[in-house]
Regions:
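Bacterial Sec-dependent N-terminal signal peptides
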Residues: 1-38, 237
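Transmembrane beta-strands of outer-membrane beta-barrel pores
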Residues: 44-46, 58-64, 80-84, 91-97, ...
Length: 237
């Protein structure tokens, strides 16, 4: 049994090295290709117990390529935890703006179901199916209102890194698919297929610091296929 535990620990260390090298390689490629974003997220757990969780979040997202835009957002979400399953519901609000785009507000109520399955050596397979209702309100004259629904499916792994300290690291690679028929004309990135890699540091006080990179393949009304690269930093307390 001890030899088996040592074996899986070595495997996880090799996997971590591979994921870090992959992250560096993709990041280097991103600077010279397509569109580049960053996103900052601050998350607060308003309530948490064995069955329920309530979370508030503020975020900022920025596209650097022209025509560039910025987006401020706030969201609230609740979760009902049931062993390996969790049910979620929430409401996100966003304001996207810049001088050279159609500025707009977005309200996004959503619901989701998540399933976690332990595999081996504390590695967990995580799947989430999410449906969003997106309501857009533009500022320019004449003002317009558009809305549609979007389905999202994400699958990924939570890979804990062995550590003697109370604080720890988790590596989270994942894929996500977005499905929609008729996007709004001013919404550029409604259909996507994403690959992401996130590193999560959990401190002794249960706060978490997250770093992530996502490669996005998306489709819009004006181009068949484009690529985006998102760098993410988040803090949860």
């Amino acid at each position: 049994m001890i030899n088996l535990i040592v074996f899986f620990k070595e495997k996880k260390r090799h996997l971590l090295k591979f994921l870090v090298l992959l992250f560096i390689s993709i990041s280097h490629h991103a600077y010279s290709q397509h569109e580049f974003f960053h996103e900052l997220v601050l998350e607060k757990k308003l309530m948490e117990n064995e069955k329920w969780e309530l979370i508030g979040e503020a975020n900022f997202k920025h596209l650097y390529n022209e025509p560039a835009w910025r987006r401020w957002g706030a969201s609230f979400a609740g979760a009902r935890k049931m062993n390996r399953f969790s049910l979620f519901g929430g409401l996100n609000g966003y304001y996207t703006f810049n001088r050279n785009i159609t500025n707009f507000f977005e309200m996004r109520p959503w619901t989701a179901v998540q399933f976690k399955l332990p595999i081996v050596a504390k590695i967990v397979l995580r799947q989430q199916l999410k449906y969003e209702w997106r309501f857009f309100y533009t500022e320019e004259q004449p003002k317009t209102k558009e809305n549609y629904g979007r389905l999202r499916y994400q699958v990924g792994l939570d890979i804990p890194i062995p550590a003697k300290e109370e604080s720890s690291w988790t590596i989270r690679p994942y894929f996500e698919w977005f499905f929609i028929k008729d996007p709004a004309e001013f919404e550029r990135f409604s259909n996507e297929r994403d690959f992401g890699l996130m590193a999560i540091k959990r401190f002794k006080n249960e706060h978490k610091l997250s770093f992530g990179f996502t490669r996005e393949v998306y489709y819009d009304l004006f181009a068949e296929r484009e690529y985006g690269y998102l760098f993410f930093v988040g803090y949860s307390f």
